[in-house]
């Protein structure tokens, strides 16, 4: 249900265009969710949840989780207008050889919601953050279905 609502929020964000961005003097999403301390706590919980999630933890078996947690913080801080610069690789390059499925991407999304719940970020703010991340799915997921019917348009991918 949360995933559906997250997708619904994405549509609302895309339709609303720049309405998701803070105007002059308005607090940013970064500030609204609680700033650095809250976001760092959420990313720490997120990594802990991922580590214990048998649906996806194998993907991170050879990952430096401290560095990964920092990259997550930078990325989330950046997209929520916290003033951070993301120093990691782009999503397509970082995930190119991992063969991540839609099911694994959805599991990661569920884990993110759980992390946000654990640090008491309100659900409406969770949806705003997830909506900002949702466009990355195309660069991360590698099991896009391609129809065998030549009359059906096939995704071009990257």
Question: Where do the language-model regions lie?
Answer:
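Positively charged n-region of N-terminal signal peptides that target proteins for export
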Residues: 1-4
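Bacterial N-terminal signal peptides
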Residues: 6-17
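Core of compact, soluble alpha-helical bundle domains
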Residues: 21-158
